[in-house]
Regions:
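Binuclear metal-dependent hydrolase catalytic cores
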Residues: 1-140
């Protein structure tokens, strides 16, 4: 059974008791994080599912309320004892954005694997039982 947990669904500004955009998906013990807004680490900690076993992160787009929590999340992931590679999926220019944010977390005990997915060409990512596809949507 697929479990879906909204870790944060607030707008552009974090409020007490409401974190920015992040969703954690779990199926058969495998987990994927979708977006990583501020407060994502707190949401995961409160949920109690743990950090080390998160298989991948999918970034939907590069608005700050969807990615500003990435450096802290990566540091927490490193402090959890993770040494296996961690995959980040996202639209172009994924490497540019992740490398810029990773300046805050330059030395991690695991490698980051980047998988750029574009809605302009057929592309598909896979992690465990999850299949990730990019599709165009309107977002205001």
């Amino acid at each position: 059974m697929l479990e879906v947990c909204l870790l944060g669904c607030g707008g552009m500004v974090p409020l007490p008791g409401r974190r920015l955009t992040s969703v954690l998906l779990r199926q058969n013990g495998r987990m994927i994080l979708v977006d990583c807004g501020e407060g994502t680490q707190v949401g995961i900690k409160l949920l109690g599912w743990g950090f080390k076993s998160i298989d991948a992160l999918c970034i939907t787009h590069y608005h700050a309320d969807h990615i500003a929590g990435l450096p802290g999340f990566l540091l927490t992931l490193g402090n959890s004892g993770r040494t296996d590679p961690f995959t980040i999926f996202g639209p172009p220019p994924l490497a540019y954005v992740v490398n810029a944010l990773s300046v805050i977390a330059p030395q991690l005990p695991f490698d980051i694997q980047l998988e750029e997915l574009s809605d302009q060409r057929k592309s598909e990512g896979r992690i465990a039982e999850f299949i990730i596809n990019a599709i165009p949507v309107d977002h205001i």
